[in-house]
Structures are given as structure tokens and as C-alpha cells.
């Protein structure tokens, strides 16, 4: 009789014991020297995983009793990394982070281990974001990782308006010529306008003028001067005085300026590249006058006072929420004829005009507030049913593709007003909740730290309004809460609230702001409002119509301006500020 027995995980058992022997310096027959550190290992193990070691053994005709010594330059691989590599060779396990991925790639290159290179490639793909895409592109070019290079390049192209801004330019000025030229040549480059592209080129050249002046002539050809404002053209002309062999470029600039003096003024928008960004307010979903739920997505182009339809949502809903992050708009929740609180979540790609289904929210929500902070999408508060409020703050984890509970507000509320400060803090200001059995807005400010998941500061103040307030930071530590009946300045440092005489005028249709309106701050103390319910003071609350107009409030003057009317009058639509690429205008 014959029986075969197989040990479970025997290979792992053997390698674990060999690794213990390595660390105890037992039975070693090779050593790796890095700086003043010596690491002992077994030739057979490393020869099995590294073609480099196998080649050294065979080319030197090493005998069984011979010992192999390898000296590694510490400027190429650190002792810490060599120790990590040896652990990986013996166990097949490695922990990759943004801090060690470059050295691990060097190790994979040095020892010629393609499996480790694949792991590093996968890590870079999964962890890429706006903050690291420039560094990742450098790594991809250095180690010839095409997939990473393509994704990182797209990240830089889609966020060029950030990298060319004062906030991001400190790192971007070190961009290699081959990458910088490729970006300027890209028609889909996401610049604020062609002025930013020309200014970025000049600043990039002057950052290392002696080395980069030779690239100016070639890169200048990628700029459409007809799309550049007179002010920036004059700025560029003055800068060219400090460069050699730029007389022809100066002549081109002067020619454009001269032509403009002789022709009728026209919008520069028609000359912008396809990727140039338009500040826009995007309206999604809502309920129509006869009760039908809407799935339309409309954009108001601020610069042109123009409405256009972008797309149709994958579902019809009102009281949903939306926020933008880069080229994407995220939507979630809402109510329909059948379901009062939807869990569904979607992402709209403004560049490709396409929708992607996201994992559902953990609970169905209406009147929640979506917001983007530090490039991450959050959902704040909301209702799961009439008079049932939640305090949950959810975060969407792009890498794991899941909604996570990030923390909780101090009070369960819906219809909250939220403003961000920096890349870390959310200020959640007032909201609706049950007070002594009645739905009421409460005077509370929660400072939520997205890094720790805690409400690090909670301030309460007497509230005399039940309308949705407008928020702004007039000074670094002064949060302004403006409403129709009462306005408050909250000193976050002194934890003190003070009433002010400034108030928000009611809408031109004599209605106050509430959760049914689409409200969006668009910068420069201006606030966009459209849709919502219109009620008159001399009729019962049940008699209402839907506001068919759009308005713009200048908070500096306290006056409303009537804008171009939206395509449809909608109650409780979602609303967010977004930067749309110019190419969408070609759809009109």
C-alpha cells in the first residue's frame, strides 16, 4: 500500500525558517554591504528570485564553498530598503508607501525582479491623486512605467490650473522640458484661460533661465495669442525683453494688439483651447411644477450668462445632493415617487460626458449636504425619513471604492450649510432638526476635522431665523453667517458670536431662501440662486409655485440681479459650482 501525504503551506514554512536563519546569520554564504551595514543571506534563495544574483554566480564560476559579496552604493539603495528587499525575497510580502516606492523601484531594477516592479506599478496607480501626480510622473518616466505615466499625465493635465497657480507652482516649476512641452501642446489642457498658459510658460523659463531659454521658441508656438488678454500680452512683451532672440515673438504680440485696436471688441472665449475651464453652476434633478421628478443636468455658464443642457442623470430625483471634484460631479441620495430616501450614488465625468455607478450610500438620504474638502468627497447629515435626522458624516474612499463613516455632527440635522477652510476642516453651520416636537433650524457651528474624524470645536449661538443662511470667511478666524432676519459674525478663536447689521435681502420675488432653492457661492462675495418654491405672504402655505428665475446676489452691495432663466423651473434640485471644459460649448 502507498499513501501520499502533503504538508500544508510547506513552502511558506521552509522560507520562514530560512528567513529566521538569515536574520540570525546562520548558514549564510553571501553578504550585501550597504554603507556600514552588512546583510547576510543564502545564495540559493536570492538566485531563485533575482537574475542578477544568478548571473553573478554563474559568471564567476562560484563553487559550493565560495561566498558571494555584493557592495551597493548607499546613494542608490539605503540599508533600510535592502532589509525590506531581503524580507520580500524570503517571504513574498512587501509594504509599499509613497515614502519607499521610489527606492523599491530601484531595488526591483537593481535585482531585476519584475514581480516587485509590478507591485510598485499597481501601488502608484491606486494611490495617485492631485497632490502626488507630478512626482509620480517623474517616477514613471524614470522607471519606464507607461501605465503610471499615462494616468499621472492625465492628472497633471486635468489639474494644470492648480499647478500653474501660486499654490502649486513651487513644485511645478521643476517640471522637465519634455513634460512641460507636452502639456502646453495639449488642446485638452485644463487651464483657466490661455493667459494662464502663457504666464506659466514665462514663469517656467525664468525659473531656470539659462537652461530653459532655448525651449521658449518651440513652446511659444503652442500658445494661441488670439485667446490671450491685452494685459497678459503686454506683460509677456515686457518679459521677452530679458530674453535673447525673441524679437519675432514680440512682433507677433504687437501684431495681435494692433489688430484689436482696429477691430470690434469680441469675446476671447471662442479662441480658447478645448480644455480651458469655464466657471459654471450645475443644476441636477429636482421636481417639476406638475409633480414629475427631473433627471436633467443643466449648466449656467457664469461668464456668458448662458444656460445649456449637459446630460441626463441615470435616475430621477429631488432633494438629492451634489459636489464637484476636478473633472467629476458626484451625486447621491434624493427622493422619488416610490422611495423617500435613496442610497444610490453616481459620478459624472464632465470631460467625457459619461456616468459611472458608485457604491450605494450606507443609508438612504434626502436633504443631505455633499461637499469636497482636500479633494475628498463628503456627505453631511440628512434625513432618512420625515422628521428622522442623522448626524453621520460619510467620506467616499476612492481607493477602496466605498463610503466610510468619517465622523458625526454634534446634533442630527438636515439642510445644513457647510463651508470648507483649507484642505482639512468642514464648518457645518445650522441645520434643521426637531426642537420640542417642531422642525426648526438650530444655531450651532461644528468644526469637523477630516483628518481625525472629530468635531474639534462646537459653538452655539441664539438664532432668530428659520431660513437657510449664507456663509463666508471675511477674515481668517471670522465666520460670517448671513440671513434675512439676523446675521452673525463668529470669532472662531475667541469662540464668540456677535450680531451684525448686515442682512440678506429677500429674493426679487419676495421669498426667503430655504432648502428648496439651489444656492451656490461663486466667489467674489456673489451667490447664485435658482429654482425653489415661491410662496406669497397673503396665501396659505399649500398654495405655491416653483420659481422660474435665476438670481445673483452681490453681498458687497446687497442687491440681487436677475439672470437668464433656467430651461426648467425646479423644486429642490441639487446644485454645485464646477469648472467645465470649453469644448462643451461645441454641443450648443
Swiss-Prot record:
Superkingdom per UniProt: Eukaryota
Residue windows of the Kelch repeats: 280-327, 328-375, 377-423, 425-475, 476-525, 526-580
PTM annotation (Phosphoserine): residues: 149
Q: Which GO terms describe its molecular function?
A: ubiquitin-like ligase-substrate adaptor activity
Q: What is its main location?
A: cytoplasm
Keywords of the record, alphabetical order, are:
Cytoplasm, Cytoskeleton, Developmental protein, Differentiation, Disease variant, Kelch repeat, Phosphoprotein, Repeat, Spermatogenesis
Tell me the ranges covered by the BACK domain, including all copies. 133-235
Q: Please tell me, according to the UniProt entry, what happens when changing residue 42 to L.
A: In SPGF91; pathogenic; in spermatozoa, undetectable in the postacrosomal region, suggesting that it could be degraded or shed during spermiogenesis; when tested in knockin mice, animals develop normally, however, males are infertile and their spermatozoa show a substantial decrease in motility; spermatozoa from homozygous male mice exhibit several abnormalities, including abnormal head shaping, with an increase in their length and width, apical defect of the acrosome and nuclear lacunae devoid of chromatin; at the flagellum, mutant spermatozoa display mitochondrial sheath misassembly and coiling tail around the nucleus
Q: Which locations, inside or outside the cell, does it occupy?
A: Cytoplasm, Cytoskeleton, Perinuclear theca, Calyx
- Gene3D superfamilies cross-referenced by the UniProt entry: 1.25.40.420, Kelch-type beta propeller, Potassium Channel Kv1.1, Chain A
| Listed SUPFAM superfamilies | Kelch motif (SSF117281), POZ domain (SSF54695)
Tissue/organ expression: Expressed in testis, in spermatozoa (at protein level).
One GO cellular-component annotation of the UniProt record comes to: nucleus
GO biological process, alphabetically ordered: cell differentiation; proteasome-mediated ubiquitin-dependent protein catabolic process; spermatogenesis
Record domain BTB: where: 12-124
Give the linked disease. Answer: Spermatogenic failure 91: An autosomal recessive, male infertility disorder due to globozoospermia and asthenoteratozoospermia. Patient sperm show defects of the head, including a misshapen rounded head and detachment of the acrosome, and the sperm fail to attach to the zona pellucida of the egg.
Give the matching PANTHER family.
Answer: KELCH-LIKE PROTEIN 32, LD33804P
What's its job? Required for both nuclear and acrosomal shaping during spermiogenesis.
Q: How does it assemble?
A: Interacts with CYLC1; the interaction may be relevant for proper acrosome attachment to the nuclear envelope.
Write the protein's name. Calicin
> What gene name does this entry carry?
CCIN
Amino acid at each position: 500500500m502507498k499513501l501520499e501525504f502533503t504538508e500544508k503551506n510547506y513552502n511558506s514554512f521552509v522560507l520562514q525558517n530560512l528567513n529566521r536563519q538569515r536574520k540570525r546569520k546562520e548558514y549564510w554564504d553571501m553578504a550585501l554591504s550597504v554603507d556600514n551595514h552588512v546583510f547576510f543571506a543564502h545564495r540559493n534563495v536570492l538566485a531563485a528570485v533575482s537574475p542578477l544574483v544568478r548571473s553573478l554566480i554563474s559568471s564567476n564560476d562560484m563553487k559550493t564553498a565560495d561566498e558571494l559579496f555584493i557592495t551597493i552604493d548607499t546613494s542608490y539603495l539605503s540599508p533600510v530598503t535592502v532589509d525590506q528587499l531581503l524580507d520580500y525575497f524570503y517571504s513574498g510580502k512587501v509594504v509599499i508607501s509613497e515614502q519607499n516606492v521610489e527606492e523599491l523601484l530601484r531595488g526591483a531594477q537593481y535585482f531585476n525582479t519584475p514581480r516587485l516592479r509590478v507591485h510598485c506599478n499597481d501601488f502608484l496607480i491606486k494611490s495617485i491623486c492631485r497632490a502626488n501626480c507630478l512626482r509620480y510622473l517623474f517616477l514613471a518616466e524614470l522607471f519606464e512605467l507607461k501605465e503610471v505615466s499615462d494616468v499621472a499625465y492625465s492628472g497633471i493635465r486635468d489639474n494644470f490650473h492648480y499647478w500653474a497657480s501660486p499654490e502649486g507652482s513651487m513644485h511645478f516649476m521643476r517640471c522637465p522640458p519634455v513634460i512641460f512641452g507636452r502639456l502646453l501642446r495639449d488642446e485638452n489642457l485644463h487651464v483657466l484661460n490661455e493667459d494662464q498658459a502663457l504666464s506659466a510658460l514665462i514663469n517656467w523659463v525664468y525659473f531656470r533661465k539659462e537652461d530653459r531659454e532655448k525651449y521658449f521658441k518651440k513652446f511659444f508656438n503652442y500658445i494661441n495669442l488670439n485667446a490671450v488678454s491685452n494685459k497678459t500680452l503686454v506683460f509677456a512683451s515686457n518679459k521677452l525683453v530679458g530674453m535673447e532672440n525673441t524679437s519675432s515673438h514680440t512682433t507677433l504680440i504687437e501684431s495681435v494688439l494692433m489688430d484689436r485696436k482696429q477691430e470690434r471688441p469680441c469675446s476671447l472665449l471662442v479662441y480658447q483651447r478645448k480644455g480651458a475651464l469655464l466657471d459654471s453652476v450645475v443644476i441636477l434633478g429636482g421636481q417639476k411644477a406638475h409633480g414629475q421628478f427631473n433627471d436633467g443636468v443643466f449648466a449656467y455658464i457664469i461668464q456668458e450668462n448662458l444656460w445649456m443642457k449637459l446630460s441626463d442623470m441615470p435616475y430621477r430625483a429631488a432633494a438629492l445632493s451634489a459636489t464637484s471634484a476636478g473633472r467629476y460631479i458626484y451625486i447621491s441620495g434624493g427622493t422619488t415617487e416610490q422611495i423617500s430616501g435613496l442610497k444610490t450614488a453616481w459620478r459624472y465625468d464632465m470631460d467625457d460626458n459619461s456616468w459611472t455607478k458608485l457604491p450605494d450610500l450606507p443609508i438612504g438620504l434626502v436633504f443631505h449636504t455633499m461637499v469636497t474638502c482636500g479633494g475628498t468627497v463628503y456627505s453631511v447629515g440628512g434625513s432618512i425619513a420625515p422628521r428622522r435626522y442623522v448626524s453621520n458624516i460619510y467620506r467616499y474612499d476612492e481607493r477602496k471604492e466605498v463610503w466610510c463613516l468619517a465622523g458625526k455632527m454634534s446634533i442630527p440635522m438636515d439642510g445644513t450649510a457647510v463651508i470648507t477652510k483649507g484642505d482639512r476642516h468642514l464648518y457645518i453651520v445650522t441645520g434643521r432638526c426637531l426642537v420640542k416636537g417642531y422642525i426648526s433650524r438650530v444655531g450651532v457651528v461644528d468644526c469637523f476635522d477630516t483628518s481625525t474624524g472629530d468635531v474639534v470645536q462646537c459653538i452655539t449661538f441664539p438664532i432668530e431665523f428659520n431660513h437657510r443662511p449664507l456663509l463666508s470667511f471675511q477674515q481668517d478666524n471670522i465666520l460670517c453667517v448671513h440671513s434675512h432676519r439676523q446675521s452673525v459674525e463668529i470669532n472662531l478663536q475667541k469662540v464668540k458670536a456677535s450680531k451684525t447689521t448686515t442682512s440678506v435681502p429677500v429674493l426679487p420675488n419676495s421669498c426667503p431662501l430655504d432648502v428648496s432653492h439651489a444656492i451656490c457661492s461663486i466667489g467674489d462675495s456673489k451667490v447664485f440662486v435658482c429654482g425653489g418654491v415661491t410662496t406669497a405672504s397673503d396665501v396659505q402655505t399649500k398654495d405655491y409655485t416653483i420659481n422660474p428665475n435665476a438670481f445673483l446676489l452681490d453681498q458687497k452691495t446687497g442687491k440681487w440681479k436677475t439672470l437668464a432663466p433656467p430651461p426648467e423651473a425646479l423644486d429642490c434640485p441639487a446644485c454645485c459650482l464646477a469648472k467645465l471644459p470649453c469644448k462643451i460649448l461645441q454641443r450648443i
